Regions:
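Glycan-recognition and catalytic cores of secretory/periplasmic carbohydrate-active enzymes
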Residues: 1-122
Length: 122
């Protein structure tokens, strides 16, 4: 038996977009804690039930998406989320040479800790 194909309609496309927007805003992927406020989490460890680190690159994708959604919808919540992510990046990860720290460690036992001193320069 073959897989049933989902017919793409305007209705289910709109619903999928709404669900994706709700997830990005309500999932907790963007930090609300004082220490990491505005940053976007990277990998979630289901065994430890916590995020391992904050990845600067993902923050860049996130704030770009938030600006796009703001421009499309004029919903100021998207702009507010983008600004909080940008402020966190600049304050916590930007280096004097203009680059950004690769990641910020949350779980000190993460296997990704070796990247904490690397810098993105793009």
């Amino acid at each position: 038996m073959g897989k049933k194909k989902l017919a793409l309609t305007k209705k289910n496309l709109k619903q999928s977009i709404i669900e994706a927007e709700n997830w990005i805003l309500l999932s907790g992927i963007q930090n609300s804690s004082k220490k990491y406020f505005g940053s976007v989490n990277a990998w979630y460890d289901p065994k430890k039930k916590k995020y391992s680190f904050i990845y600067s690159e993902i923050n860049g994708y996130f704030l770009t998406l938030m600006v796009y959604l703001y421009k499309r919808s004029k919903n100021k919540l998207y702009l507010k989320r983008a600004i909080s992510s940008a402020k966190w990046l600049i304050k916590n990860t930007q280096k004097k040479n203009g680059g950004f720290s690769c990641l910020t460690v949350i779980d000190k036992h993460s296997s990704h800790n070796f990247k904490k001193d690397l810098i993105y320069s793009f």
